[in-house]
Amino acid sequence: KQALEALTSEMIPVKYNPYPVKTHGIDNMPYVTCNDAFINLDEPDISLDLSQKIYSKAKFMGSHCQGQTEIKLDSIGPTIRAEHHGNIEYRRLSAEHGGKHTDELAKGLIERRLTVRECARIQTFPDDYEFIIPKSESQPSLSSSDAYKIIGNAVPCVLAYNIAKNIADKWNLYFK
C-alpha cells in the first residue's frame, strides 16, 4: 500500500522511483549521436544485412510534410514514428532539398531515407535482431513497413532494460 501511494503521488520519492537515474547530458556522459549509432554500418547497396539494405523509397514531398527532413548526424536521433507511411526521416537529402551532408553527396552517396537498421540502432536494438524476414514455408514474412512500425512502437531497448533492472532491484520494496 505504501509503494502504491508513493508511485501514484505527483512527486515520486526517489526510493520508489522505477525510472533509472539520468546518465547522459550536461554533467553526465555525452548523448549518443546518430554518428555514434551508425558506426560501422555499410551503405545499403553493399550491406549484407537485409535490414540495412532496405529503406523507404517515398519521394520527397517538401519540408511542410512530416518526415521530410535530414537527420543531424552530430545530434540524437529523431523520433521513430510507428505510423510514418513511408515518410521516415532522410539519412541524407540533396542540396536542392535542403540537405547539409554535401560531403557525402560529393562522394557519390545518394539521397535516401533511414534504413530499417539505422532506425533500429537509434532505438538501441542489437544488430542480430532480424527485422526483415522473407516469406518462406516455415515462417511468416515481415516487411520493411512492418519493421518500421515495430521499431517505432518500441521502447528503446536500453531504456527498457534499465527500467526493468530498476524495478527488479526495488521489487521487495514494492511488494512487501
Where are these regions (language model features)?
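S-adenosyl-L-methionine-dependent DNA methyltransferase catalytic core
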Residues: 1-176
